[in-house]
């Protein structure tokens, strides 16, 4: 028999089975056996073709239980808005100087927020931030005059999501140390946000498959009906 990968050795059940949401959460927690606090990840297969402009799915969701991770925020702003960002807890704040640092390879942040007046500057960073999914965008609230609130949202559990080429959305929605109730609430919030972001061009079944896993654990398929969608 072929040797199972390490992340599958603990689970001997039927990998093709589907589970109600609460049962899937229990299984993910029970199989998160690494020596670190594993991230719990959701994968949602959507009935969209991202190659078409009218089938793009992108947005932001405030997870009610937070993410369990320390989010480092960079803000591109100046004067009073720069001070507002610092007061809200942004780790890195700057204008032309910060743009030049990022162009030079500085990437010690998880989220980039910018004020609208800085977008001409930020445009220089498209090739650097775009492929990493970090480019500020007004559609997800990372281009805004309200930088203080945006920083607080990012640090308080607000995450961005975007459909990938295969029509799948991946996101970290908590830690294995979270309670079952916390993880369940975050999953429901994520699926609700995806439903609200349903594009006009989506036809047929929108939420097709949902699975939940931890960083080193197996994936468990969730019965979509148990999500109320």
Curated annotation (Swiss-Prot):
Write the record's keywords in alphabetical order, separated by commas.
Answer: Repressor, Ribonucleoprotein, Ribosomal protein, RNA-binding, rRNA-binding, Translation regulation, tRNA-binding
Cellular-component GO terms for this entry? cytosolic large ribosomal subunit
Say if the entry is tagged with keyword tRNA-binding: yes
Look up the domain of life of the source.
Answer: Bacteria
Q: Does this entry carry the keyword Amino-acid biosynthesis?
A: no
The set of disulfide-linked cysteines is: none
InterPro entries recorded: Ribosom_uL1_bac-type, Ribosomal_uL1, Ribosomal_uL1-like, Ribosomal_uL1/biogenesis, Ribosomal_uL1_3-a/b-sand, Ribosomal_uL1_CS
Write out the GO MF terms: rRNA binding; structural constituent of ribosome; tRNA binding
Task: Supply the SUPFAM superfamilies for this chain.
Answer: Ribosomal protein L1
Q: Tell me, which GO biological process terms does this entry list?
A: regulation of translation; translation
Q: Which family does it belong to?
A: Belongs to the universal ribosomal protein uL1 family.
Tell me how this protein assembles.
Part of the 50S ribosomal subunit.
Purpose of the protein: Binds directly to 23S rRNA. The L1 stalk is quite mobile in the ribosome, and is involved in E site tRNA release. Protein L1 is also a translational repressor protein, it controls the translation of the L11 operon by binding to its mRNA.
Q: Tell me the protein's name.
A: Large ribosomal subunit protein uL1
Mind giving the lineage of the organism this protein is from?
Bacteria, Pseudomonadati, Pseudomonadota, Alphaproteobacteria, Caulobacterales
